[in-house]
Amino acid sequence: MNPGKGPDSTRGMGEIKRQQAAGEFAIGRLVSARRSAAGAGRARGVAITWRMARNELDIRPLSGAVGAEIFGVDLAQELDAETVAAIRKVWLDHLVIFFRDQDLPPAKLLGLARHFGQPIEYPFVKGIDGFPEITPVIKLERERVNFGGLWHSDTTYLEQPPMGTMLVAREVPPYGGDTLFANMYLAYERLSAGLRDLLDGLVAVNSSAKADVTQTREDRIRDHGRNDARPEYEALHPVVRTHPETGRMALYINGGHTIRFKDMTEEESAPLLNFLFAHQTRPEFTCRFRWDVGSLAFWDNRCAQHNPINDYHGFRRVMHRVTLAGDRPR
């Protein structure tokens, strides 16, 4: 198999799930769980090691709420089914996973993504040359606005929002530019029983017009002097969704795209929405990731939100993003 192209999405998901269900392979074995000192500049934490036929994964949680770093695997190499299944399990358990020091040119980035889902094109920003599914996420030295600079889950204004997103760092500032992530399982579970009962029956309206989270250098160049409006998208989704793989319930609104509740005005919706927006990003639900060139993050849009911090004015930051097709939230 060509490692640049990777396996097709059926092999990446359906075949692995079939093998797991049939008991044709197990996801390695737990070797140790220990407290260890990470490398320079990295947090200390409990390291969990999974040993498999071809790889030994060292898993280090980034916080008590969300996120884990995975060491011991070269993502540019062809991944066997056991390793893919192990990575997917850590991803489902921790909602966002991080890898460092990865050499992933565009073809190999797409090949990696296809192990976990079907890459899709982003509706507002043109992909890089030759790879329409890879979105450039760029902030130049002179620019003041960053891409997606607020808490959100990607493109919830679509009828079928992406289930996951991969982001790899190509150029990073000398400091700043970290990304925050938040656990929407915890955001739902920490609400009172009465409020959970109320939210379980509500539907939210999500719109691409609420916040200009797609304003990038390319957008500004394209829109300068033009009168034609960009298309707007709107979708209805349950305020609380059930994760199709874990079965857990997660709060599924976000400050970037959710504008109101169905059958309510924005004014009527605002008090409860504003409370929930503040609640779902409480510090105890979050982690913070510092990027280096070659770092890759892979997050689950169905149960996590993210917020790229815009604190590196005067420096250049270049990332490549791949989103994976999802289903309609239920």
Protein language model annotation of sequence segments:
Residues 13-16, 30:
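Periodic, rod-like helical contexts
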Residues 2, 9, 17-21, 25, ...:
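Short terminal hydrophobic/aromatic SLiMs and anchors at protein ends
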Residues 49-296, 301-330:
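Non-heme Fe(II) oxygenase catalytic core, chiefly the N-lobe of the double-stranded beta-helix
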Residues 15-18, 37, 165, 313:
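Residues in and immediately flanking transmembrane alpha helices
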Residues 33-43:
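Compositionally biased, low-complexity flexible segments
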Residues 5-10, 14, 142:
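Residue-level detector of transmembrane insertion/anchoring sites
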